[in-house]
Amino acid sequence: MQSRAYALISEAALHHNLSGLSARAGTRLLLPVKANAYGHGLELIARQAAAHPDVWGLAVATPREAQAVALLNLGRPVVLLTPPTPDEVVPLADLGVRLPVSSLEEAEALPVHARAHLKVDTGMNRLGARPDEAIRIGQRLAERGVLEGAYTHFATTDEEDLSFAHEQLRRFRSVIAALPPVLAHCANGGGILSLGHLGDMGLSRPGLASYGFAPAHLQRVVPLTPVMTLRATVTQVHKAFAGESVSYGGLWQAPRDTTLATIGFGYADGYPRNATLRAHVLVRGERRPVVGRICMDQCMVDVTGLEVRAGDQVECWGSGDLTVSEVAGWGDTIEYEVLTGLGERVERVAVP
């Protein structure tokens, strides 16, 4: 059975973005594939990324994600960015997953065959050890022969004021300087685009930027192409007569006799319900409004004057004039939330 909505995932666009970001950073990449690869499909993106020479490894947020990627046997290291539970440490180490460490207790608990990445809190106040303590932990990991990397996370590199980002970088470098050589990584996508070359780091971790998106003031730094195009199937074409209402609540009434196409994509699939009465889609390359309230499984589009039939495809977002950024704006949210909220009913399809 075919899906009513599907996401085309462009390997060419992904590789284009990865090449540009790696060149800008002056490092190889540790590509975040957490949250189902930002909604793009974990296995699909992991396989596409592993084929790119600038990708050193793949970063995940949960032990289950780490296990899933490790079992693909792609020949790229898998780095877990958030703490596992004590009973998960050995099974993950057995799979070769690189483990985060932010306390002496965690450092001592690692098996001898583990590879650790020291987590340093330079100001995000989310995870990690503060710099002074991180140095002690890192030195102990080095003594045990399990220290491979060290990392931190920038809090403000998407902003125009980079003063705090520079302070975080200074703090992180003070830790790195006190340790034996490690694979250091700190730059997210915003960090790569705003701070530029960080060749003293071994790796960079561009998330959303790898999938084609950047803050407005940074969009010209590295040309990026959205990796995903979202298409949905027309399930019915019918008439609404002048004055009739469409969808729940009667929020929209037809100003004239109107041809409507119902498409199989709704808020259960990830289309923001808050985009009601603002959203548009592309029908045969032409922008057409989504009318009435967006439903759980479908929505209705004004296609008056166009030749449309059941089974046709419409584009809900892509790499052209109608992007996820615009959809997120209609939904009063951000690209991250739209992409990671894309439901499992939406089939991910690899394209060249």
Curated annotation (Swiss-Prot):
Its EC number is 5.1.1.1. Its cofactor is pyridoxal 5'-phosphate. GO terms for cellular component: cytosol. It is an enzyme of class 5 (isomerase). The modification N6-(pyridoxal phosphate)lysine is found at K34. It comes from the Bacteria. InterPro entries: Ala_racemase, Ala_racemase/Decarboxylase_C, Ala_racemase_C, Ala_racemase_N, Ala_racemase_pyridoxalP-BS, PLP-binding_barrel. GO terms for biological process: D-alanine biosynthetic process. Pfam families: Ala_racemase_C, Ala_racemase_N. SMART domains: Ala_racemase_C (SM01005). It catalyses: L-alanine = D-alanine. PANTHER family: ALANINE RACEMASE, ALANINE RACEMASE, CATABOLIC-RELATED. This is Alanine racemase. It comes from Deinococcus deserti (strain DSM 17065 / CIP 109153 / LMG 22923 / VCD115). The gene is alr.
